[in-house]
């Protein structure tokens, strides 16, 4: 896990030309090391249990630890194998070569990694230090890159596409998926970090991360981080002590926006910064200041609350934690309904940078499929065979065929490639972590931070497809979430 968090995001061999295969190869290497270590440990454990004649007892203990998410993950892997076995192109379905390297091999391997992490992670916070180190390094390279200092000479042979490749990650959509998980995680990581020095560096990382939002040519990061922030706001409202951290994040966002606006209006770097539509809207109308103003208001109210009589403070805390938090849930529900109606009434093939056409051809391909394909899909990573057939059928002009290799929507991707059963499993992967969190008596910040990362993945998954690095991190967070749930159950059983 340490190697995956630190080295996997940074490794590349031939600039951006082979970066997907690079990430895949390194993941295979780290996975094999992990599998070998676990296999040896299991063999030693098995020998000891046989000697002590405790095989059946240990088997019962392990079976009792199986949870709903374990079952979903196992079924998902089995469905991927079956779908590939009956697909028209087994080789590409296995490798995922045509779909950002997330094929059946990756799915099965990641499920094994999930089971290892969910059983072996002990809850030690040292893991997050390595996550911070790897992410901070990649983020620093990305910011320097966006300002026009290509010190790694990554863009040397593709100057015309400078703005759509970044850092050691690759395409800006991959970058968006990566940060959509890690920014929300570190927004809450401060709450379980005791060392003030460490808190300072987390806030410094967040300042840099917010700055990167403004200067990168992608809106997807705003979507992923924004949706995760909805959960973070609710979590903060449930305990007024957490509001200070939320306020600081709002102020940091405003500061980052101010720096970005200065560089945007006064270009002084080798290359003018890139701004997508959301960044341009925030900078032109100074809307980035709103979170900062709200943060200052929250801090002032917290200071006033500290000097108020205890009776008034208790009433104010009750209002925030029991009434305002519930009102926020209702606001989210109204927002979801509004977003659905907006998409329905404004749907066209050019919607969201031609994602409308990708979604349309993907869904029509699903509808035109056989009963088997509707239930089990055409095979993981084979979406392009469906979309290209639909494009030819509609006689639709496509300038960039590679855009249609993935559905740019996680659920739709698996609906077409793994059928209704695969999409149902994927949907359950989204829902079960919320159930795990809700049923827990101790809603620790660590668990909330991991859930925030998973929500960020769901958010970015509305507009991007599965990408190997993002997918690996998502699986790791799922495994950690299951491990926290397992430890909480064990603690409750002892009590």
Summary of predicted features, one role per range:
Residues 14-26, 87-98, 150-168, 223, ...:
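Membrane-interface interhelical loops and short amphipathic "cap" helices
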Residues 18-31, 90-115, 213-222, 324-339, ...:
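Alpha-helical transmembrane segments and their immediate interhelical/interface regions
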């Amino acid at each position: 896990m340490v190697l995956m968090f630190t080295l996997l995001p940074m490794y590349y061999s031939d600039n951006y030309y082979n970066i997907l295969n690079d990430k895949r190869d390194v993941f295979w290497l780290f996975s094999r090391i992990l599998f070998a270590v676990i296999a040896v440990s299991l063999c030693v454990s098995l020998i000891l249990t046989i000697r002590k004649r405790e095989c059946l007892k240990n088997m019962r203990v392990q079976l009792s630890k199986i949870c709903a998410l374990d079952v979903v993950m196992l079924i998902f892997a089995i469905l991927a194998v079956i779908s590939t076995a009956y697909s028209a192109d087994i080789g590409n379905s296995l490798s995922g070569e045509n779909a950002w390297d997330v094929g059946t091999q990756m799915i099965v391997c990641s499920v094994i990694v999930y089971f290892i992490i969910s059983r072996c992670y002990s809850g030690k916070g040292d893991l997050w230090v390595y996550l911070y180190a790897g992410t901070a390094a990649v983020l620093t390279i990305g910011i320097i890159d966006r300002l026009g200092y290509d010190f790694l000479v990554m863009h040397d042979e593709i100057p015309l596409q400078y703005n759509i490749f970044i850092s050691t990650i690759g395409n800006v959509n991959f970058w968006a998926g990566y940060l959509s998980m890690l920014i929300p995680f570190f927004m809450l990581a401060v709450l379980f970090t005791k060392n003030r020095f460490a808190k300072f560096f987390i806030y410094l990382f967040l300042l840099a991360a917010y700055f990167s939002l403004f200067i990168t040519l992608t809106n997807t990061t705003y979507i992923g981080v924004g949706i995760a922030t909805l959960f973070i706001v609710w979590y903060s409202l449930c305990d007024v002590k957490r509001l200070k951290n939320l306020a600081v994040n709002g102020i940091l966002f405003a500061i980052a926006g101010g720096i970005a606006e200065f560089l945007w209006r006064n270009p002084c770097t080798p290359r003018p910064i890139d701004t997508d539509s959301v960044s341009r809207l925030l900078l032109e109308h100074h809307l980035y200041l709103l979170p900062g103003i709200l943060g200052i208001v929250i801090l002032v109210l917290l200071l006033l609350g500290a000097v108020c009589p205890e009776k008034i403070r208790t009433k104010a805390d009750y209002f925030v934690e029991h009434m305002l938090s519930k009102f926020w849930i209702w606001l989210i529900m109204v927002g979801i309904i509004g977003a659905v109606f907006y998409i329905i009434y404004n749907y066209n093939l050019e919607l969201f940078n031609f994602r409308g056409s990708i979604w349309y051809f993907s869904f029509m391909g699903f509808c035109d499929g056989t009963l088997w394909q509707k239930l089990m899909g055409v095979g993981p990573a084979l979406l392009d065979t469906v979309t290209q057939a639909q494009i030819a059928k509609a006689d639709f002009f496509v300038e960039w065929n590679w855009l249609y290799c993935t559905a740019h929507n996680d659920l739709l991707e698996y609906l077409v490639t793994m059928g209704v059963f695969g999409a149902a499993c994927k949907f359950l992967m989204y829902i079960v972590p919320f159930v795990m969190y809700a049923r827990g008596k101790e809603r620790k910040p660590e668990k909330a931070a991991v859930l925030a990362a998973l929500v960020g993945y769901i958010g970015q998954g509305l507009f991007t497809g599965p990408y190997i690095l993002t997918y690996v991190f998502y699986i790791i967070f799922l495994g950690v979430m299951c491990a926290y749930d397992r430890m909480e159950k064990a603690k409750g059983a002892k009590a």
